[in-house]
Amino acid sequence: MNEKATELDLVNTHFVSPHGLDDDEHYTTAYDLAVLTNYALNNDKFKEIVGIKTTTITVGDYSRTITNTNELLGNTEGIYGVKTGFTANAGRCLVTACKRDNLDIIIVVLGADTKEIRGLDTVNIINYVYSNFEMVDTYNMISEAFENYKETQNINVTKSLEEPQIRLSNNFTYIYPININEVKNLKTSIYTISRIRCKY
């Protein structure tokens, strides 16, 4: 577990046990939990399991129905996981994954006094994000910048110290969540290499 934490660059996380009971050497942060959750959700089986609200386990003649302790699962639009937690020191904790309008978010609430507060804080954050942010595809902005870009200076390099690696490409796209009020302020700039090493 600690090897995986190092691999994911979870610098504020250290595991002592898989059950997570209180220990001075067992700790993490909301950010690290979000990174870990994002990684785990790439595993289809994990994603399936954390999204199950109830299931029945049958062994022989014995059956038992178990219910997910995530009270928001199935009761709040877009939520598809992930995990509740509680210890005396940690308080009520909840890591939540939600998707609305093609925007996936992960919310981490730690140290709540009650399950109700934990759930309310999570829902409030989710509603804030989806009310104030939207996904913006910058492809058209970048393409327009490249179309309008004009080279203003030619440089002749007769004896370069190494093969020049100069490339200008608009064959890419970026999609970001951006505050709705800031979308109109987006600008695209192209910066050229300011110095090329060569000998005369």
Each language-model region and where it sits:
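Surface-exposed aromatic
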Residues: T13-D23
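Short, charged, amphipathic alpha-helices and their helix-cap/turn boundaries
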Residues: M1-T13
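Asparagine-centered polar/low-complexity signal
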Residues: N2, S17, N68-N70
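Domain-terminus/edge residues, biased toward the C-terminal soluble/receptor-binding domains
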Residues: L10-V11, E25-Y200
